[in-house]
């Protein structure tokens, strides 16, 4: 049966079926293959308009949505963190109704999953989750598109996520693994293992993923030993130790908690020889940002793991042939284009 997602919102990936998620990944691969022609010959969504509502800034998410919109022939409005009264002087419900009356689709990137849910409920148009504290579904689609392009069939592949396994990227990666039938190992602090499986706001998601693994194959497991976990891995993935919006003062605590899970060449060498490294970016892999330089200067002597300014991944890994994070970043464009086209056009 043909997949029809017209009018749907990408609020949570868990509201989709296995067939629908894999369809979006394959559609993105197809769109990438015809990307040049699409630029100059085809504007399938000409006359439509979308709005990007950002509470959190982002390079990749904003650029991917804007370029996707232009490629598809649409108008696109960006509203940044200070550009609206969303949830402050105007209720989310009222904002949703206003935007829904003017636009054909709404992208939201912010904090609360409940804000996405409210936009879906009251806007009357497709809403796309560009990131919340709970989930990052457009990133997940790009992650598995990248793996499929580089590795072929996803079923039975092994992916290892090392670091803050309770965050939205790790959660979305687990959800994606359950949809595509991959084995995922979450490598992080022991206390987070219990949280991800049974914590408030986590348990239901974990149980839904377990049901999907039963259906599609694959598995989720946990480890505190990054080298053991990396054995036979096809993919090693990490993310920043401190998310956008969290206070800088938390860095020392995170270094203490997560430093042992830094992705280094020992971990890469423990994996398959053709292992790929992925990161949703931005990455702290050297001292070339103000944040990482400050960490190096203030904490590098106390904590040797960050003495170069690198945090979640060493610069040696990031500069190696294994790093596919920039292909992954480009694939944000193709997967977002697939989501827009599927929900507005097909």
Curated annotation (Swiss-Prot):
Pathway: Amino-acid degradation; L-arginine degradation via ADI pathway; carbamoyl phosphate from L-arginine: step 2/2. L-ornithine binds at residues 168, 239, 243-244. Keywords: Arginine metabolism, Cytoplasm, Transferase. It is found in: Cytoplasm. Pfam families: OTCace, OTCace_N. GO terms for cellular component: cytoplasm. The keyword Cytoplasm applies. Its EC number is 2.1.3.3. Carbamoyl phosphate binds at residues 58-61, 85, 109, 136-139, 280-281, 332. SUPFAM superfamilies: Aspartate/ornithine carbamoyltransferase. GO terms for biological process: arginine biosynthetic process via ornithine; arginine catabolic process to ornithine; citrulline biosynthetic process. The keyword Cell inner membrane does not apply. Gene3D superfamilies: Aspartate/ornithine carbamoyltransferase (3.40.50.1370). One of its GO terms (molecular function) is ornithine carbamoyltransferase activity. It catalyses: carbamoyl phosphate + L-ornithine = L-citrulline + phosphate + H(+). NCBIfam families: orni_carb_tr (TIGR00658). Reversibly catalyzes the transfer of the carbamoyl group from carbamoyl phosphate (CP) to the N(epsilon) atom of ornithine (ORN) to produce L-citrulline. Belongs to the aspartate/ornithine carbamoyltransferase superfamily. OTCase family. This is Ornithine carbamoyltransferase, catabolic. It comes from Mycoplasma pneumoniae (strain ATCC 29342 / M129 / Subtype 1).
């Amino acid at each position: 049966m043909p997949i029809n997602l017209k009018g749907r919102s990408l609020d949570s990936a868990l509201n989709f079926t296995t067939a629908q998620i894999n369809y979006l990944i394959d559609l993105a691969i197809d769109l990438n293959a015809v990307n040049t022609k699409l630029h100059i010959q085809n504007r399938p969504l000409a006359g439509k308009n979308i709005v990007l509502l950002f509470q959190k800034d982002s390079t990749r998410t904003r650029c991917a949505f804007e370029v996707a919109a232009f490629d598809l022939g649409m108008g696109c409005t960006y509203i940044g963190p200070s550009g609206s009264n969303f949830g402050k002087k105007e209720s989310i419900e009222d904002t949703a109704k206003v935007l829904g009356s003017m636009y054909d689709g709404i992208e939201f990137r912010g904090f609360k999953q409940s804000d996405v849910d409210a936009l879906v409920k009251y806007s009357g148009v497709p809403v796309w989750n560009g990131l919340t504290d709970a989930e990052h579904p457009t990133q997940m689609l790009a992650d598995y598109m990248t793996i499929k392009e580089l590795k072929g069939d996803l079923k039975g592949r092994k992916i290892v996520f090392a670091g803050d396994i309770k965050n939205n990227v790790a959660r979305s990666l687990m959800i994606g693994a359950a949809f595509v039938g991959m084995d995922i190992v979450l490598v992080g602090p022991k206390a987070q293992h219990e949280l991800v499986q049974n914590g408030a706001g986590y348990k239901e998601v974990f149980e839904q993923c377990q049901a999907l693994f039963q259906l599609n194959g694959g598995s989720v497991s946990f480890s505190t030993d990054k080298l053991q976990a990396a054995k036979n891995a096809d993919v090693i993935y990490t993310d920043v130790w401190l998310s956008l919006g969290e206070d800088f003062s938390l860095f020392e605590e995170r270094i203490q908690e997560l430093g042992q899970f830094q992705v280094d060449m020992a971990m890469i060498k423990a994996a398959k020889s053709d292992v790929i490294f992925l990161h949703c970016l931005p990455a702290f892999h050297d001292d070339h940002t103000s944040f990482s330089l400050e960490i190096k200067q203030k904490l590098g002597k106390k904590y040797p793991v960050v003495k170069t300014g690198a945090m979640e991944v060493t610069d040696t890994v990031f500069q190696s042939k294994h790093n596919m994070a920039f292909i992954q970043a480009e694939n944000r464009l193709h997967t977002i284009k697939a989501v827009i086209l599927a929900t507005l056009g097909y």
